[in-house]
Amino acid sequence: MVFGSRPPALTEANIGDQSGKVFIVTGATSGYGLLLSTYLYQNNGTVYLAARNAKKTAEVIADLKQRFPASRGRLDSISLNLSDLSTIKKSAEEFLAKETRLHVLWNNAGVMFPPAGSTTSQGYELQLGTNNVGPHLFTKLLYPTLAATAKEAPKNTVRVVWVSSDAASWAPKPAIDFNNLDYRRNESDRSKYGRSKAGTVMQAVELARRARKDGSGIVSIALDPGIANTGLQRDMGRLMSTMVKLIANKPEIGAYTQLFAGLSPEITAEVAEKEWVVPPGKIGCPRRDLFTDTETSRKWWEWNEEQVKAYL
């Protein structure tokens, strides 16, 4: 989705003082995640950069501290590999050993069009495992802390933000094929990626429903950051990469969209069950079955629960 004439609702210039708030951004060392982390830190937020490469994360933190010496925020790192479920509990514990509050979790990390046959450590197709199963486990492990924070924070301000894509519309109907989650019957690259991003939306919506029912006060919202030339496209072919460059927004637009999803007062629990966020930061209409097919969402959530239970 290409950004038109409407200016972003929230930017680094107007999100206000984030002092006292604790955030986690996954995939925080490049692309949208890096920009988002930058905006939060320069406005005095405590930001945990969750990423795989510890050396790169340390370099990013050092750079941000040098660029924004006046920030009263704090930066820290979490080693996070979403493609290996056996490591994710340790990642969550790394955070929980330091913090008792968490205001917003941005599930931003993901993969797109990896080499054919790529799988996670547990054997899931790489996009399914990294974009869906891994974030499910990480979110589940942090959920009690989010819920505890929501009891003290203003209503609708504690959130889980799930970064999907307009590519969710590429998923065939029904969006989740429970008889082919191992892809023993091969599908196109477009279909596999689309299903993973449709799955992200359905995880967000199902968590929103469950959070309302359990009274936790957590808002769970999905978003489409738009098209930008970020590190996510590193495994695309040359033709696709060229097309992306021709139609892409600046990466800042995707980061502003994420700011809106995580911080805008327009986002409420009621909105999150019915709509998602689109560039450059506004409530938009997604593919409707991803929100209305409650039976598939429930089964999808329960399938993910089954996959992660051995790693809690």
From Swiss-Prot:
Described function: Short-chain dehydrogenase/reductase; part of the gene cluster that mediates the biosynthesis of aspernidine A, a prenylated isoindolinone. The starting point of the biosynthesis of aspernidin A is the production of orsellinaldehyde by the non-reducing polyketide synthase pkfA. Hydroxylation, methylation of one of the phenol groups, and prenylation, presumably catalyzed by the prenyltransferase pkfE, would be needed to yield aspernidine D. Subsequently, the cytochrome P450 monooxygenase pkfB is responsible for hydroxylation of aspernidine D to yield aspernidine E.
Mutant phenotype after disruption: Abolishes the production of Aspernidine A.
Biological or metabolic pathway of the protein: Secondary metabolite biosynthesis
Binding site for NADP(+): K56, N108, K140, Y193, K197
Oxidoreductase found in the keyword field: yes
Keywords assigned: NADP, Oxidoreductase
GO MF, one annotated term: oxidoreductase activity
Top-level class of the enzyme under EC nomenclature: oxidoreductase
Pfam families given in the database record: adh_short
Active site, renumbered: S164 (proton donor), Y193 (proton acceptor), K197 (lowers pka of active site tyr)
Family, as annotated: Belongs to the short-chain dehydrogenases/reductases (SDR) family.
GO biological process: cellular response to farnesol; secondary metabolite biosynthetic process
Highest taxon, organism lineage: Eukaryota
UniProt source species: Emericella nidulans (strain FGSC A4 / ATCC 38163 / CBS 112.46 / NRRL 194 / M139) (Aspergillus nidulans)
Entry protein name: Short-chain dehydrogenase/reductase pkfC
UniProt keyword NADP, yes or no: yes
Gene that specifies this protein: pkfC
E.C. numbers: 1.1.1.-
